[in-house]
From Swiss-Prot:
Gene assigned in the entry: MSTN
GO BP field: cellular response to dexamethasone stimulus; embryo development ending in birth or egg hatching; muscle cell cellular homeostasis; muscle cell proliferation; myoblast migration involved in skeletal muscle regeneration; negative regulation of insulin receptor signaling pathway; negative regulation of myoblast differentiation; negative regulation of myoblast proliferation
Subunit architecture: Homodimer; disulfide-linked.
Domain of life: Eukaryota
UniProt source species: Gallus gallus (Chicken)
Annotated family: Belongs to the TGF-beta family.
GO cellular component terms, A-Z: extracellular space
Name of this protein: Growth/differentiation factor 8
Length: 375
């Protein structure tokens, strides 16, 4: 009997030595396994984040139809960028894009009206080239996304050079038309009288909404405009073709369009932060910083919240995808299983320089992960 007790004691001692028990009752190997699991999850998320950033770079260039990032220095950008109030407001607005995808029970971006501001710069026109003499500006091409019944606001911005004394300036905006029998080539759009004080030049906006809507209804009538701004001595103060020291002072159109998309219900997914221990498929935050890439050619936004998906898709959580579960049950070896992937994405608005040093406005689709799921 005593020998049996000794054997039992030795057996228990060896078990403790091989598998020591912590004071709180948990085993050390279990704790290590949990730590290893968390480390593996962190490593996986870090790799996923890096892959997401590289994919974003490729997607942006591809969707903008650019073979490579435009090579434009910051000094050149300062010369080309219009120094106008509405553009600066737009840059400030998109400096850091907000992430509203988790607010409310409805899709904010699908339910509320969204307004876009489009900055259109003047381009060359065959009609202007064929005219005798040099017109005082300007021909504008318009994006197909601008529909006449969606235009909320259309402002022509012109820069007036400084004056040396209090001066009255007469501004006239003319629309070019096909020559009439009497030789008329212009029709008036707007005329106004301004009082200018000595000092720096000023930006002046003129409402051209009606004209723009007519152009959109009848594109063939868009032949361009002429801008005149004379002081009392006959000096033209309007900057139409910028001279030395007048970079960024070109005339341009600021157009605001609005639309109210179809209302839809939100299908919630999981949202996590970088310190989360959640193992299931989840959306994690990721801020893309274009300046960190050296992509100075992107005017706005400089940063935006892209987000990414990471996590496991276990079959026990797949009530939403019964067909996937049935396929796995029928052929478990041949099914790779569902992946954690974006189930809803939204676009970002972007102002950027293309390879020809032109300022372009565009909406890039599917750049923000709003929701993640298993599919």
């Amino acid at each position: 009997m005593q020998k049996l007790a000794v054997y039992v004691y030795i057996y228990l001692f060896m078990q403790i030595a091989v598998d020591p028990v912590a004071l709180d009752g948990s085993s050390q190997p279990t704790e290590n396994a949990e730590k290893d699991g968390l480390c593996n999850a962190c490593t996986w998320r870090q790799n996923t984040k890096s892959s997401r950033i590289e994919a974003i770079k490729i997607q942006i260039l591809s969707k903008l139809r650019l073979e490579q990032a435009p090579n434009i220095s910051r000094d050149v950008i300062k010369q080309l960028l219009p120094k106008a109030p509405p553009l600066q407001e737009l840059i400030d607005q998109y400096d850091v894009q907000r992430d509203d995808s988790s607010d409310g029970s409805l899709e904010d971006d699908d339910y509320h009206a969204t307004t876009e501001t489009i900055i259109t710069m003047p381009t060359e026109s065959d009609f202007l080239v064929q005219m005798e003499g040099k017109p005082k500006c300007c021909f504008f091409k318009f994006s197909s996304k601008i529909q006449y019944n969606k235009v909320v606001k259309a402002q022509l911005w012109i820069y007036l050079r400084q004056v040396q004394k209090p001066t009255t300036v007469f501004v006239q905006i003319l629309r070019l038309i096909k020559p009439m029998k009497d030789g008329t080539r212009y029709t008036g759009i707007r005329s106004l009288k301004l009082d200018m004080n000595p000092g720096t030049g000023i930006w002046q906006s003129i409402d051209v909404k009606t004209v723009l809507q007519n152009w959109l209804k009848q594109p063939e009538s868009n032949l361009g405009i002429e801008i005149k701004a004379f002081d009392e001595t006959g000096r033209d103060l309007a900057v139409t073709f910028p001279g030395p020291g007048e970079d960024g002072l070109n005339p341009f159109l600021e157009v605001r369009v609005t639309d109210t998309p179809k209302r839809s219900r939100r299908d919630f997914g999981l949202d996590c932060d970088e310190h989360s221990t959640e193992s299931r498929c989840c959306r994690y935050p990721l801020t893309v910083d274009f300046e960190a890439f050296g992509w100075d050619w992107i005017i706005a936004p400089k940063r935006y919240k892209a987000n990414y998906c990471s996590g496991e898709c276990e079959f026990v959580f797949l009530q939403k995808y019964p067909h996937t579960h049935l396929v796995h049950q029928a052929n478990p070896r041949g099914s790779a299983g569902p992946c954690c992937t974006p189930t809803k994405m939204s676009p970002i608005n972007m102002l950027y320089f293309n390879g020809k040093e032109q300022i372009i406005y565009g909406k890039i689709p599917a750049m923000v992960v709003d929701r993640c799921g298993c599919s």
